[in-house]
Curated annotation (Swiss-Prot):
<dbReference type="InterPro" id="IPR050580">
    <property type="entry name" value="2H_phosphoesterase_YjcG-like"/>
</dbReference>
<protein>
    <recommendedName>
        <fullName>Putative phosphoesterase Bcer98_0945</fullName>
        <ecNumber>3.1.-.-</ecNumber>
    </recommendedName>
</protein>
<comment type="similarity">
    <text>Belongs to the 2H phosphoesterase superfamily. YjcG family.</text>
</comment>
<keyword id="KW-0378">Hydrolase</keyword>
<dbReference type="InterPro" id="IPR022932">
    <property type="entry name" value="YjcG"/>
</dbReference>
<feature type="active site" description="Proton donor">
    <location>
        <position position="34"/>
    </location>
</feature>
<dbReference type="InterPro" id="IPR009097">
    <property type="entry name" value="Cyclic_Pdiesterase"/>
</dbReference>
<feature type="short sequence motif" description="HXTX 1">
    <location>
        <begin position="34"/>
        <end position="37"/>
    </location>
</feature>
<dbReference type="GO" id="GO:0016788">
    <property type="term" value="F:hydrolase activity, acting on ester bonds"/>
</dbReference>
<feature type="active site" description="Proton acceptor">
    <location>
        <position position="115"/>
    </location>
</feature>
<feature type="short sequence motif" description="HXTX 2">
    <location>
        <begin position="115"/>
        <end position="118"/>
    </location>
</feature>
<dbReference type="Pfam" id="PF13563">
    <property type="entry name" value="2_5_RNA_ligase2"/>
</dbReference>
Length: 172
């Protein structure tokens, strides 16, 4: 089964991102706006319980933290993805690193750059035009993050939450 681990921002941030994603992201209908902690990976269904236990341990070791989202960035020229920048806090870095250790180890395709995708699969001309327009706008949001989610992908390529993990000691 295909799994992924993400943080969902507040509804306000999701609404702002979706206003842009509707027009510029072909994956708009497949998954809500999110910050990827661990890129999609394959795991046999019989390992799911072990993965869930490991994620509970990680959640218990991580305190809630403030997420800062602002400004627009791009991964060009590697690919034409436009995103809201997310400040790389020690907590986000810790979560990402923990999700690539031990049982969850996997080869990373890219360095960890926390972000919220708002446009992708654009032509070079579309990318330049949209990025230029969005960089002129002022975006800044912050919120407390107290959970992350393990997602699984369905046959129709949509993603659903398998389990939510609350941050901090005493979380279940």
């Amino acid at each position: 089964m295909k799994l992924g681990i993400v943080i969902f921002p507040s509804k306000m941030i999701q609404d702002k991102a979706n206003g842009l994603r509707k027009r510029y992201d072909p994956h708009y209908a497949l998954v809500p706006p999110h910050i990827t902690l661990k890129a999609p990976f394959e795991a046999p269904e019989e390992q799911l319980e072990t993965i869930v236990k490991e994620l509970r341990t990680i959640a218990n070791k991580t305190n809630p933290f403030t997420l800062h989202v602002g400004k627009v960035g791009s991964f060009a020229p590697v690919n034409n993805v436009i995103y809201f920048k997310v400040e790389k806090t020690p907590e986000l870095t810790f979560l990402n690193e923990e999700m690539h250790k031990g049982f969850l180890t996997q080869e990373r395709e890219y360095a960890f750059v926390p972000h919220l995708t708002i446009a992708q699969k654009l032509s070079d001309a579309e990318h330049a035009d949209i990025l230029g327009r969005l960089r002129m706008k002022d975006f800044y949001y912050e919120q407390t993050i107290d959970r992350f989610h393990l997602l699984y992908q369905l046959e129709n390529e949509t993603w659903n939450v398998h389990e939510t993990f609350h941050l901090g000691k005493g979380s279940k």
